[in-house]
Amino acid sequence: MPQSAEHVLDHVELFRGPEYQQMLAKKKIFENPRDPAEVERIKEWTKTAEYREKNFAREALAVNPAKACQPLGAVFASVGFERTLPFVHGSQGCVAYYRSHLSRHFKEPSSCVSSSMTEDAAVFGGLNNMTDGLANSYKMYKPKMIAVSTTCMAEVIGDDLNAFIKTSKEKGSVPADFDVPFAHTPAFVGSHVTGYDNALKGILEHFWDGKAGTAPKLERKPNGAINIIGGFDGYTVGNLREIKRILELMGIQHTVLADNSEVFDTPTDGEFRMYDGGTTLKDAANAIHAKATISMQQWCTEKTLSFAAEHGQDVLSFNYPVGLSATDDFIVALSRISGKEIPEQLARERGRLVDAIADSSAHVHGKKFAIYGDPDLCYGLAAFLLELGAEPTHVLSTNGNKAWQEKMQALLASSPFGQGCQVYPGRDLWHMRSLLFTEPVDFLIGNTYGKYLERDTATPLIRIGFPIFDRHHHHRSPIWGYQGGLNVLVKILDKIFDEIDNKTNILGKTDYSFDIIR
């Protein structure tokens, strides 16, 4: 063998050894072999316009959808509250997926439990699982709140969360006055952004509307505070901290709902923090009195904002404010709603972003980009690219709907750089592959899964989105606000300059442009 206890090889090198190469060659012959020439022919055919037409005609199949399921979003929202334990009514395997997905992106532990439903619960219902699960969770993990959501299994058989939680309390699983908000989050409809919305609405409904009949409904007494909702966001650590900094600079009384910026960025100091930070339960209840609720992501919070509006609040939503104009709109709205002046420090930060754009616009201007991801992220990035004079040629969102498509088209139509750009709601990354082959662009913007498109189509990938598994700590830096816009600009420019270097580094042939100044 090529390694020993004294010489352990990384997997990158290990499988290149002669023993593994021989094994893999035999495996290829044994497992459904195909003529290499035929494989090559089909591969080339999948790059054609003819194949693209067939690809876009499919209806009953998704290949590499750029979305996740509802319970992931529910877990993400739930951990944003003080000492809250997400409890997913379903199987252990599903919950392992949510935990690993969040842990691999944020490089932090992700605490979540399940009711461990198996075959018997799928037939007879999961009441016993709920009863035992709530009791064990309450005793073992000492939460202040347990937020319940569901998986496909529980939804298909029709388990009633409200009834199950009441019965569990009657059986003594948790105290009668213990907070157990819930939301039905069927994974076979919607996506993780839907689950975020459902879970957040469920938690606010619990506190504002009488805790499932166990307490009086709260009576709203309006004050001057503003509620902020970040939405499902892979940059929640950096972005929420940036938004809170802006609010504090402006002197605005505020509550960030579902504030998970601390639990996904805990320090290593000898103390394990299963729960850290989060919106306090008292603040979650008092949020009913706020003057307004502002969502940073429209498509993440449609139900929650409607719920806040029903309780008499002014509501306002943005679409992932990246760049100059989007941040202007956000800060002006804060000033208008709160009556506070915009501080000089923010004006200076704006000027620095304008200066950076002016310094680098020649390198970005006219470049073609393809973008995929969640609806609000795609909108925010496309808007910023238009500001930079770039062309968001393909904008694809698997969980985007018709309303999102219309809003995106209006954005593209508002700029000369958006002419000829196309929007693709409900499409997946196999559709994007056809687009990149038949209508090539200069750069691709998306999450880690875009690296396969980068390999197949040779389109350089700029990693922005969720999840980012193969790069570390991107989530710690904001991409909202003026500072966030500068961070995104740097990401784009770094990739542009890397590509220039890659294309000019052959000694004596292309290195006449291998410059140290760009």
Swiss-Prot record:
CDD domains: Nitrogenase_MoFe_beta (cd01974). Its cofactor is [8Fe-7S] cluster. One of its GO terms (molecular function) is ATP binding. [8Fe-7S] cluster binds at C69, C94, C152. One of its GO terms (biological process) is nitrogen fixation. Keywords: ATP-binding, Iron, Iron-sulfur, Metal-binding, Nitrogen fixation, Nucleotide-binding, Oxidoreductase. Binds 1 [8Fe-7S] cluster per heterodimer. Its EC number is 1.18.6.1. Tetramer of two alpha and two beta chains. Forms complex with the iron protein (nitrogenase component 2). Belongs to the NifD/NifK/NifE/NifN family. Ala-187 is present instead of the usual Ser that would serve as a ligand for the 8Fe-7S cluster in the oxidized state. This is Nitrogenase molybdenum-iron protein beta chain. It comes from Bradyrhizobium diazoefficiens (strain JCM 10833 / BCRC 13528 / IAM 13628 / NBRC 14792 / USDA 110). The lineage of its organism: Bacteria, Pseudomonadati, Pseudomonadota, Alphaproteobacteria, Hyphomicrobiales.
